[in-house]
Amino acid sequence: MRRQEPESPLVPSSPVALVVQKFGGTSVADPDRIKAVAEHIVATRRRGDEVVVVVSAMGKTTDELLRLAHEISAAPAARELDMLLTAGERISMALLCMAIIELGEPAVSFTGSQAGIVTDTTHTKAKILDIRADRLREALAAGNIAVVAGFQGVSTDSDVTTLGRGGSDTTAVALAAALGADACEIYTDVTGVFTADPRVVPQARRLSRISFDEMLEMAATGGRVLALRSVEFARNYGVRIHVRSSFTWEPGTWVVPDEELEVEGMEQPIISGVTHDTSEAKVTIVQVPDRPGVAARLFRALADEAINVDMIVQNVSSQGHTDISFTVPHADLARTLKVMEDHVDEIEAAGVTHDADVGRVSIVGAGMKSHPGVAATMFETLAAEGINIEMISTSTIRVSCVVAEADVNRAVAALHQAFDLESAS
């Protein structure tokens, strides 16, 4: 699969000293796509830029490796699972290097460990502690394109680790920060960040720019374009991200600091997008004694099991008791119910209920900070559609509602229309 390069350059015409490019699994799913990505990288290098590439495993390789692991063991040892899963990126990085060399440019591949990505000791969900990028700098200084396996590092105990969901995005942004890159380009199977999921709202519009804070909220509430941790890295270290498609030459979406938008004199829209997430379940602890310390004990027990709790709602107390509802990822539901059931008698609550058939719909926009009535418009829109709101949470630039899963797509479409996002400038 080869693409003809357009007359206009891929990025602004002025040379960039150093660019980090990340390519996901769909971009390198087969040899033809790997060759196309190699041409893309070589074109950037021949424009005069230094290039560091971060690559994911080919296609569904990681899923296939996970399937194999679970055929062997119902609960694979975490250390060995990390050893297995990192094989996927090692394959793609080596093949991509071969393709680049075949085009006449020098390239060197690095595992996460060889690239100096140091993590904590948490297998399958490791956090990056440090990046010792000396070998990458040496490779660049020698005129090489450096190709790094995403999603992996080495722990302080010298064990191979993986970074969890979205780990290759996080690898790319972290390397861009450590190397002082001028930009981090994230190549995906979509052309950028949209005002809603185009599969749900065909009229959804691609955003040319969005702030770090808005992107963080979108990533946290169901936007799948960028991993949440990668956006956190970008905001903390001021790394500008360009999200674009591997398959077209269309301009993508720049994710930039808030102040960059302000300097350019761009008035931020009230709402930038509508997101949705159907990967969570609602859990309710019924008739919890309303006294100090009870909620703390419940949520400490969940934290000790590394269960991430999202939205939390506590009903108004009645006769000394209250209901506490919260959401957790579907993958953690069984463990959550076990932890809560172990504590129900201890805290003298009546019981635990759950609903796995829910979804979250959110509106995100920096402009809502200075515009009253945004939440009211959201609630009125959902009411007009006959959609019941089960839970509500807010931040300064986001309002989220939990609704029945069957109503999620209808809610997204209605909110997108209510805030006129398809025609916003």
For each feature predicted by the language model, list its residue ranges.
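Short hydrophobic alpha-helical runs that function as membrane-insertion/retention elements
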Residues: 52, 183-187, 241-243, 310-311, ...
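Short phosphate-binding/catalytic loops that engage adenosine nucleotides
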Residues: 49, 105, 239, 307, ...
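Nucleotide/pyrophosphate-binding catalytic subdomain
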Residues: 1-231, 327, 402-404, 419, ...
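Structured, non-catalytic alpha/beta "coupling" segments that mediate domain-domain communication
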Residues: 97, 237-238, 242-243
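A conserved regulatory-domain signal marking ACT and ACT-like small-molecule sensing domains
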Residues: 252-425
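Acidic-aromatic/histidine active-site loop/patch
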Residues: 234
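Active-site phosphate/pyrophosphate-binding segments
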Residues: 247
